Amino acid sequence: MFRLSFASIAARLAFAGALLASAAAQAASCPVHYLDGRPPEIQNQKLAVSTRELCYGVFGVVHSGVTRTPLWSAEYVRADNLKRAQGLDRDDKFHAESRLPRGQRAELADYARSGFDRGHLAPNANMPDRRTQRESFSLANMVPQDRDHNRKIWAPIEGAVRTMAKKEGELYVITGPAFLGTSRKKVGNVIVPTHLYKVVSSPRQRLGAAWLTENRADAPINVVPVAELERIVGIELLPSLSTKQKERMLRLPTVKPSKKRS
């Protein structure tokens, strides 16, 4: 019979404990941005390769060195911060994220003459002061986004979230790209997402729901349960809610695409 010595068992338990401690430490890096302090959990392990957590003032990012984009950006959106944000003029200072290795991050040159916008995940318009506004212009908070999608579809969705937050007082929001299908398009070294999603959860109602759209100009705006979106993207986005809660739908405003010219 195969037997492990006490020392061997102790060593294995210590190693497992170290792994758990490491995971817990990473999960707790910026818990304030997540519902109940619990960040999303990656189920599709292909997505977990070369990921790093980055904490900012009013949002947090988990960045992929493979796609050179965020996997998600998380915000605790408060009505008082949005009121402060209304008094700020936009100051466009896009920059590469110095905390990321050069071989895993997006550079300004990747987007140059690409025809794609540098699309914010955590919106600049949610930032309450100059410091957080500058943080939002890090390329670690950006994905390559169809220009008309950004202006005509995504901007109205972001506005709807702000309207909700002012009524609710507070919301937790997770915004991310999806890379569905087998073909991959790049701008420079950055992979272009096929879809974008925005999950909104209410701590008061203990419910969430999500907008999901293709990354193209004429994409329909879909509203889906969190449970369905989790299956699509391979990430448990709201791990502190039960399956039943995630199958129910938080009521989201109807969003119509803007007809303004780009």
Describe the residue ranges of each PLM region.
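Domain-level detector for secreted/extracellular nuclease and nuclease-toxin modules, and
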Residues: 2-6, 19-262
